[in-house]
Amino acid sequence: LKGHMEPSKLHYHGNNKSDYDIEYGIKNHAGYFIADSLDELTAINNIAARYNIRQKVLLRLTPGIDPHTHKKVSTGNTTSKFGISLSDAPSVIKEALSLPDIMLDGFHYHIGSQIFEITPFLDALDIVFDFMHKINDTLGYLPSYLDIGGGFPVRYTDDDPQINLEDYFKAIGNKLDELKNIHNINPGIMIEPGRSIVADAGMTLYTVGSYKTNGLKNYISIDGGMSDNPRYTLYESRYTFVKANDADNDKYIKADIAGRCCESGDLLGEDVIISEVKRGDIIAVLTTGAYNYSMQSHYNQNQGLPVIMICDGKLKTVVKRDSLDDLLHNQL
């Protein structure tokens, strides 16, 4: 809203929206709520009634798909905290259709992130279209929209599989055409391309503080770590590292890239092959345009990092570095 986005185009996600969240979205005319439970549907209905608004909703389904990705970013399996199982969904849909201040406009699902195989996307479509067919037969309900989520991958290292997103979308488009004809169901389709359109647009620069070896491992310590990028700590997500101030140096070492937090697990990478470094060198971590700045914290009282945008060869600061006072400004 502060960025002057059209409110009607906003989709309000989250598996546990508070009453404050719901009221804020409704009174600011958010286009859709992605409802995660019957409790949430009831809350949306009750709050919408106070504003005399019939709120549009997509119901998040859990199709029970294994997307063959890291378990911590697998969001569409039967044990996921997200969404409503297909076995429970019919009763929830029936209730949603009875709520006077809810407009159930369709369904949403998202099976996970960094999915390098097309099969899980196609399997999910088969399952959800079959489900929609059954719902039409039993409840007479046809969705206006189906949001199939995202999960389209990016390559963080050369070891990641080669991908062609055009092939993904062609396969998904062909499958949609097939299923619409089979089931005679034709909802508008939404997708969430997410990191696949922004990850490669960013990199993170760190300054080397020290380089040391303990006889078993080499360590490069940097002025950041899990407080600004927790992905390796959380999922052992791998990155490509480059010595930015001397990229052509062909003398390589193997080292762990260590952060400055008080955790032995505060690493950005292990056994990384990188040019020899010394104190003051700059290391670039590539492909951090998604899930880096948005995941940073003040853990260990580390300052938030600045973000610099490059446009037409010009630099523009779009996020300022936190000052020490910024770390304390909410403390009484």
Label every model-predicted segment:
Residues T138-Y145, I182-M190:
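Flexible, glycine/charged-enriched surface loops at secondary-structure junctions
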Residues L1-Y145, V154, K175:
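Active-site-proximal beta-alpha core segment in soluble small-molecule metabolic enzymes
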Residues E117-A124, R155-D167, V198-S210, E270-I273:
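Short glycine/threonine-rich loop-to-helix capping motif typified by GTGT followed
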Residues I65-T69, G112, S144-D160, M190-A201, ...:
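Flexible glycine/acidic-rich beta-alpha junction loops that bind and position SAM and/or redox cofactors
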